[in-house]
Structure formats: structure tokens, C-alpha cells
From Swiss-Prot:
InterPro entries reported in the protein's UniProt record: Acid_phosphat_B-like, HAD-like_sf, HAD-SF_ppase_IIIB_AphA, HAD_sf
Binding site for substrate: T137, G138, K177
Organism of origin: Klebsiella pneumoniae (strain 342)
Top-level taxonomy: Bacteria, Pseudomonadati, Pseudomonadota, Gammaproteobacteria, Enterobacterales
GO cellular component: outer membrane-bounded periplasmic space
Catalytic residues identified in the record: D69 (nucleophile), D71 (proton donor)
Binding positions for Mg(2+) per the UniProt entry: D69, D71, D192
Domain of life, source organism: Bacteria
Sorted UniProt keywords: Hydrolase, Magnesium, Metal-binding, Periplasm, Signal
Cofactor requirements of the protein: Mg(2+)
Signal peptide start and end residues: 1-25
Protein name listed in UniProt: Class B acid phosphatase
Cofactor note: Binds 1 Mg(2+) ion per subunit.
Length: 237
């Protein structure tokens, strides 16, 4: 009789525990979690700057050479890269090593790229200062390219300020942009990647981070501000 009582008690306990687990699992998560002012006001403790503050920091300085990365810095170019992957290497990054992709990307596919608003503001500010504008990209070089004209047209850059795009390419273990920033004596360089910031520093330039859009095809997203650099507010678009 004692054994039957113990067995019944154990079965009852097991049923109770299982019921609790099932109840917890089937309980829906709150649809509206809510927030508060403290959470809304919370910002990552990094060096945020605005375009106006950058302009103010350059007051009194003579015209200089300034540089911009292209993809995710001045252009949201994911549509072209997305199409390239689907066309040349579905499911892999091998298309980035395919010269056929770069021929397409550098000769027309930027017609599908969207100019970023932060780039419009920055370039307009530097043109007003009389600065020389350079674009230094990690894209592979091709025999012909229409990127320079696309950028000049998109951002209304006068011929006197515009320079041909520099295709630095990508080499493992080497920051290919550094030598170009040095050669062109670029004093300020804007980019979305860690390599852009380190290239600027290696070249003795001021590296300023532009935020990469969350829906960029280039993942993972970099940790902006992790290198102690200036990061432009609202620069993801």
C-alpha cells in the first residue's frame, strides 16, 4: 500500500510539473513590450559628430584633398551586389572574385545604387570649401568604368573638384587603400568599414565613420566607434 501511495504521489508530481512547463510554453509573449524615456534616450557611448560639427572643425583651414569610400559610404549599392551574387555565385561570396561581376558593377549597375543623404551633405560641404574630392574603393579595377560619372552626376560635383575613382582592389592581409590616401595626400577620409578607418590612420588622415545601413548586403555590420573614431549621426541613409 505504501508503494502504491508513493507511486501515485510521484505520478501526480510529474503531471503537475509537465502541466506547468506546457503552460509556460504555450503562454504567448507580450505583443506590446513598451519602452521608457531612459531607454529612448540611451545612446552608445561613442564619439558622435554631425556634418555641421565637421564643417566647423575645418573653419580656417585651406582647401585640402578629402576622400570617400564608395559602397555603403556614399552609395547604398547592395542591389548591384545582390544581383551579382544571384547571377554569378548563388549562396556564396565567390562572385566578388569574378571579373565578369566587376565589369557589370563598374559599368552600369550603379544605376541601381541609391545616393546616401549624408554623402550629399558631406560632399556639398567640401565642394563649398573648395576641397578636392577623391573616391577610393576596394572594388576591383576594370578596363572601363562609369562609376566616376555616376558619382559626379549623383552628387553634383563640379569638374574642378572631381577626380577619377581609384580602384584599390582587395588583397588578403593588406589594406590597399592606405598607399592611395598617402599618395593623394588625403587629409580626411570617410568610410563605413574598420579598414577605412585604419587606412586613414596609417596614412596620417582623419578617419570618420559613416554608418552602414542595416539592410546592407554586406554583413556582419561593423561596430562603429569601436576604434575611438568619430561617427556621423544619422548617417545610415
Amino acid at each position: 500500500m505504501r508503494k502504491l501511495t508513493l507511486a501515485f504521489a510521484a505520478a501526480s508530481l510529474l503531471f503537475t510539473l509537465n502541466s506547468a512547463v506546457v503552460a509556460r510554453a504555450s503562454t504567448p509573449q507580450p505583443l506590446w513590450v513598451g519602452t521608457n524615456v531612459a531607454q529612448l534616450a540611451e545612446q552608445a557611448p561613442i564619439h558622435w559628430v554631425s556634418v555641421a560639427q565637421i564643417e566647423n572643425s575645418l573653419l580656417g583651414r585651406p582647401p585640402m584633398a578629402v576622400g570617400f569610400d564608395i559602397d555603403d559610404t556614399v552609395l547604398f549599392s547592395s542591389p548591384g551586389f545582390w544581383r551579382g551574387q544571384k547571377t554569378f555565385s548563388p549562396g556564396s561570396e565567390d562572385y566578388l572574385k569574378n571579373p565578369q561581376f566587376w565589369e557589370k558593377m563598374n559599368n552600369g549597375w550603379d544605376e541601381f545604387s541609391m545616393p546616401k543623404e549624408v554623402a550629399r551633405q558631406l560632399i556639398a560641404m567640401h565642394v563649398k570649401r573648395g576641397d578636392s574630392i577623391w573616391f577610393v574603393t576596394g572594388r576591383s579595377q576594370t578596363k572601363t568604368e562609369t562609376v566616376s560619372k555616376t558619382l559626379q552626376d549623383d552628387f553634383l560635383i563640379p569638374a574642378a573638384n572631381m577626380n577619377p575613382v581609384i580602384f584599390a582592389g582587395d588583397k588578403p592581409g593588406q589594406n590597399t587603400k592606405t598607399q592611395w590616401l598617402q599618395a593623394k595626400q588625403i587629409k580626411v577620409f570617410y568610410g563605413d568599414s574598420d579598414n577605412d578607418i585604419t587606412a586613414a590612420r596609417e596614412a596620417g588622415a582623419r578617419g570618420i565613420r559613416v554608418l552602414r545601413a542595416a539592410n546592407s548586403s554586406y554583413k556582419p555590420l561593423p561596430m562603429a566607434g569601436a576604434l575611438g573614431e568619430e561617427v556621423i549621426v544619422n548617417s545610415e541613409y
